[in-house]
């Protein structure tokens, strides 16, 4: 009799899981192996009722361990700049000083990272002390700048709609004027007062991520007012401006392209009636970021058209300009030696508003028939040494300036005792070509992150295609030190420039306006303006400040015949709340 015994084993799955940001499931499987029992060698005798327990051999061979990780999708934590660093909505800077001066800056802002921003602001700067002019007379010398404005932006996905509106008021007094005898009715010490209202709107991108197409469309409008005090100046100048601009840019790998086009219309009213200027601008750029050289090249095209009322027909002039543009930076494998080449330029209209920004003492209602055109070229070396503690830039430059402005002054120098000697403090621009060769050096040294030393030196050689003095220095430079601490910050800087000269035209001796007779030129001496600033952070929101200017009390001039204040200072408070 044969006995057959079967044994069956089943291995049940065993699971384990672990949860540390992820779910882990581990499965092990075993496959049993069962073999047949060996038969006994002899026939057993069962009469003694003995029980036989046959031996059964079996083995278990586990399969290789298999582990499966099944991560669950987890939304990463995100934080925006505005959630991480929320600026306080209000900023105030207020101060006053001696001789009497004042400063005020106030900003109120609100920012929502998903909606947009809005900001309103007020700026004021004024000085009120009388200054003795070069004739030994103290006229009213009040000078003041005021601005009020608002700006806002609305986000539309990756694009933004922005707007800006503001009004400027710039007030000066002709304290450099003088008259021998009775100067009544000549406007001696009168006020030059300019108002400027502007509104602008743009829609588009910020041109930072060029992996997608970036674009911009912008519109601008403005109105300029002349409220100056002049005898018999009832129909005061007014000027309007309209402008439009469009730009598109895209990057492809290491390359990038951009195209820009713009249009400006400037029109005169009242005493400027019949004067207008149109400026069309187009610019093309191509850039490439290579390993050895990184460059941007292109060109700017301008069409400039001026029109003035005349008899028997209007006077019209049109000019076309092409200005090259280049930025080449070479990488020689070391941060301490980086050659570069730059070429650029600009076309600057010489309408009345632009001239008042260049020189506030310009003769009233002046509008020149050509724009100033600059072509600039620079070649040099730059780099960083000693783990970026020492930065330098050394270069030579050449500038060709067509229709450059040479500022002249007029003075009556009659020997007739019945005729008063008069200088009304008016500056008149005359255009001529100028070529400038310059040699420049700029150094910045940071031994530690909180301390900075800087030195700039610039030398100029002028080739003027006129006998008029250009009013520019042959040397200019500055040297300074600044410290930025956690509680205290301060800086000391000396601004220097060489002797400057302007042409003085003798109206009494001039008989032909095309050939003016020049008298002794006006000379501004070598100037050093020593400035000091100090900030003390009383708390995280309040800072006390002090600023000093012209502390060596030099005779300084920004405009000919108009000396600046001597040593002066301003103290006040800055607050965020």
For each of these PLM feature ranges, what is it?
Residues 73-74, 83-92, 96-135, 140-148, ...:
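Outer-membrane beta-barrel translocator/receptor signature
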Residues 92, 294, 302, 307-577:
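Exposed, low-structure sequence patches enriched in small/polar residues
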Residues 80-87, 112-115, 155-162, 206-214, ...:
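Short loop/turn motifs that connect adjacent beta-strands in outer-membrane beta-barrel proteins
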Residues 16-82:
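N-terminal periplasmic/intermembrane-space "pro-region" immediately following the signal or transit peptide
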Residues 127-130, 134-135, 139-147, 162-213, ...:
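Flexible loop and strand-edge segments within Gram-negative outer membrane beta-barrel domains
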Residues 52-72, 78-98, 115-124, 212-219, ...:
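Transmembrane beta-strand segments of Gram-negative outer membrane beta-barrel proteins
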Residues 86, 96-100, 132, 138-144, ...:
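Short sequence motifs at beta-strands and strand-loop junctions characteristic
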Residues 110-132, 256-268, 273-311, 446-456:
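Surface-exposed extracellular loop regions of Gram-negative outer-membrane beta-barrel proteins
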């Amino acid at each position: 009799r044969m006995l057959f015994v079967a044994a069956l084993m089943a291995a049940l799955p065993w699971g384990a899981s672990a949860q540390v940001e992820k779910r882990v499931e581990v499965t092990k499987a075993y496959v049993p192996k069962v073999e047949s029992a060996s038969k006994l060698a002899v026939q057993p005798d069962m009469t003694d009722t003995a029980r036989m327990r046959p031996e059964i051999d079996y083995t278990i061979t586990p399969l290789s361990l298999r582990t499966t990780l099944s991560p669950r999708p987890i939304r990463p934590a995100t934080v925006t700049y505005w959630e991480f660093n929320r600026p306080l909505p209000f900023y105030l800077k207020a101060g006053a000083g001696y001789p009497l001066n004042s400063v005020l800056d106030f900003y109120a802002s609100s920012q929502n990272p998903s909606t947009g921003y809005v900001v309103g602001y007020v700026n004021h700067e004024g000085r009120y002390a009388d200054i003795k002019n070069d004739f030994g007379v103290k006229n009213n010398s009040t000078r003041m700048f005021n601005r009020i404005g608002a700006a806002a932006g609305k986000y539309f996905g990756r694009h933004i709609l922005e707007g800006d509106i503001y009004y400027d008021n710039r007030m000066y007094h002709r304290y450099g004027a003088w008259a021998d005898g009775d100067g009544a009715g000549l406007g001696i010490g009168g006020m030059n007062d300019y108002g400027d209202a502007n509104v602008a709107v743009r829609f588009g991108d910020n041109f930072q991520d060029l992996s997608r197409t970036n674009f911009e469309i912008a519109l601008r409008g403005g109105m300029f007012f002349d409220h100056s005090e002049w005898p018999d100046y009832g129909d005061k100048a007014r000027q309007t401006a309209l402008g439009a601009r469009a730009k598109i840019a895209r990057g492809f790998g290491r390359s990038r392209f951009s195209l820009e086009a713009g249009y400006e219309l400037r029109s005169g009213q009242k005493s400027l009636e019949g004067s207008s200027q149109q400026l069309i601008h187009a610019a093309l750029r191509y850039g490439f970021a290579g390993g050895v050289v990184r460059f941007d090249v292109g060109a700017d095209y301008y069409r400039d058209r001026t029109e003035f009322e005349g008899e028997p027909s209007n006077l019209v002039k049109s000019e076309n300009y092409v200005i090259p543009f280049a930025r080449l930076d070479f990488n020689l494998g070391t941060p301490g030696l980086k050659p570069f080449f730059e070429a650029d330029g600009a076309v600057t209209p010489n309408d009345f508003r632009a001239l008042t920004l260049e020189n506030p003492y310009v003769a009233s209602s002046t509008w020149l028939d050509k724009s100033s055109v600059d072509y600039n070229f620079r070649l040099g070396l730059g780099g960083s040494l000693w783990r970026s503690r020492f930065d330098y830039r050394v270069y030579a430059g050449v500038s060709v300036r067509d229709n450059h402005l040479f500022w002249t002054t007029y003075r009556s120098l009659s020997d007739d005792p019945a005729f008063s000697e008069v200088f009304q403090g008016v500056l008149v621009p005359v255009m001529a070509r100028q070529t400038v060769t310059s040699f420049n050096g700029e150094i910045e040294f940071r031994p530690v992150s909180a301390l900075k030393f800087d030195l700039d030196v610039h030398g100029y050689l002028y080739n003027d295609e006129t006998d008029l003095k250009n009013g520019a220095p042959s040397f200019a430079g500055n040297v300074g030190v600044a410290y930025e601490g956690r509680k205290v910050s301060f800086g000391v800087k000396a601004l220097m420039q060489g002797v400057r000269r302007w042409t003085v035209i003798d109206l009494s001796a001039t008989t032909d306006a095309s050939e003016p007779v020049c008298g002794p030129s006006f000379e501004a001496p070598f100037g050093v303006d020593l400035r000091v600033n100090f900030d003390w952070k009383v708390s995280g929101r309040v800072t006390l400040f002090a600023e000093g200017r012209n502390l060596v009390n030099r005779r300084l001039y920004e405009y000919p015949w108009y000396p600046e204040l001597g040593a002066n200072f301003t103290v006040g408070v800055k607050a965020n709340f």
